[in-house]
Amino acid sequence: MLDLKFIRENPELVRKAVADRNTDAPIDEILELDNSRRNLTQELDNLRAKRKIMAKQRDETAIEEGRVLRGQISTLESELSQVDEKLTDRLLRVPNIPDPSVPVGKDESENVVLYYRGEKRNFSFTPKPHWELGEALDIIDFDRGIKLSGSRFYILKGAGARLQRALIAFMLDLHTRKHDYTEIYPPYMIKRECLVASGNLPKFADNLYHDAEEDYWWVPTAEAPLTNLHRDEILSAEQLPIHYVAYTACFRREKMSAGKDVRGIKRLHQFDKVELYKYCKPEDSFAELEKMVADAEEIADALKIPYRLKQLVTADISFGSAKSYDIEMYSPGVDEWLEVSSCSNCTDFQGRRANVRFRRTSEAKPEFVHTLNGSGLALPRVMISVIENYQQPDGSIVIPEVLRPFMGVDVIR
């Protein structure tokens, strides 16, 4: 959420930021509601002051005028409450301001590749896509996944399930033991206010799964619960930075992706992900972003899979982000660069929505923290890259060395 005072004092800057994102936001309506709110507040203050004076007088005229004032105050309080509710809703629909270092671009086609790491493998045969390899090895079962849950669901079997478990364990171990993140295992169902704080609600409700009876929401990413771990808290400067890592399943309706990537396990309603999350001081957040990217890249380096880093343009960064990078692994069977991580600095956008603050000293005024999030990494796209990059001419899959202690085998046949 943006500071209302900032919008009031910098309306053209905010309008330009929204335009650079190639989206829309109700800036004019916010300014009108803000003006109405300020006028109503002033009018209420005047009436309350007048009523206070009348309360000290005992004559019939003053008593009658006091009754009239009570009615007027009640009416204005109701109007102010409605204006406040509308204003809050509209503010929640305004995206974050892109950092000046973010390139302006109209869509993802203009994202900037910063560098490539690792060499693409030279195959002596035509590499197969993961769905062919998975079915032939009996480690992925699409038909039974559809039988159980419908399209965009699948089942991992035997060594396939073990490979995913090995990847998750390896990632969590690396991030907790080497990168010093604290592991969290959060609930998969969270309250509405958690998703408001993370920025998923109200704007993206259509892409979320919801239990309407009890108003629980299935997590679209561990970012949502991690944003709320310190909601409505005031931290000390000594506690920052805080680094969390969490593995969860993630649930998304993918309504915007209807008809896309229908084969394989690239785009699903349920998938698994290891998420990195940071709380830090404002002056440290961009350095923390670079560290987060390096932490995520180390997974790809360890797996020895070619990848590239992209800086996202203004129109492609997420709703709450001020600056984002994507890590994409190369998958030869589908001949695609697959996004396996998006690392973002959300500055104080989520901190303000979640009301997470810190004090630099015990007497200092509380400030909003900056928050960052990133995949470290996202499955099953990492699975796709492992299966396709490590396939052999006979259809078997060699297990990357770093995963062998978790798998107990060197090859899936």
From Swiss-Prot:
UniProt record, GO biological process: selenocysteine biosynthetic process; seryl-tRNA aminoacylation
UniProt subcellular location: Cytoplasm
A GO molecular function held by the record: serine-tRNA ligase activity
Keyword check for Isomerase: no
EC number(s) stated in the UniProt entry for this protein: 6.1.1.11
Annotated pathway: Aminoacyl-tRNA biosynthesis; selenocysteinyl-tRNA(Sec) biosynthesis; L-seryl-tRNA(Sec) from L-serine and tRNA(Sec): step 1/1
Binding site residues for ATP: 252-254, 339-342
Catalytic activity: tRNA(Ser) + L-serine + ATP = L-seryl-tRNA(Ser) + AMP + diphosphate + H(+); tRNA(Sec) + L-serine + ATP = L-seryl-tRNA(Sec) + AMP + diphosphate + H(+)
InterPro entries for this protein: aa-tRNA-synt_IIb, aa-tRNA-synth_II, aa-tRNA-synth_II/BPL/LPL, Ser-tRNA-ligase_type_1, Ser-tRNA-synth_1_N, SerRS_1_N_sf, SerRS_core, tRNA-bd_arm
PROSITE patterns: AA_TRNA_LIGASE_II
Keywords: Aminoacyl-tRNA synthetase, ATP-binding, Cytoplasm, Ligase, Nucleotide-binding, Protein biosynthesis
SUPFAM superfamilies: Class II aaRS and biotin synthetases, tRNA-binding arm
Cystines in this chain: none
Amino-acid positions noted as binding L-serine in the UniProt annotation, renumbered to this chain: 221-223, 275, 375
CC terms in the record's Gene Ontology section: cytoplasm
Metal-binding as UniProt keyword: no
Assembly behavior: Homodimer. The tRNA molecule binds across the dimer.
Domain observations: Consists of two distinct domains, a catalytic core and a N-terminal extension that is involved in tRNA binding.
Family indicated by similarity: Belongs to the class-II aminoacyl-tRNA synthetase family. Type-1 seryl-tRNA synthetase subfamily.
Role noted for this protein: Catalyzes the attachment of serine to tRNA(Ser). Is also able to aminoacylate tRNA(Sec) with serine, to form the misacylated tRNA L-seryl-tRNA(Sec), which will be further converted into selenocysteinyl-tRNA(Sec).
Protein name stated in the entry: Serine--tRNA ligase
Annotated organism of origin: Dehalococcoides mccartyi (strain ATCC BAA-2100 / JCM 16839 / KCTC 5957 / BAV1)
Gene responsible for this protein: serS
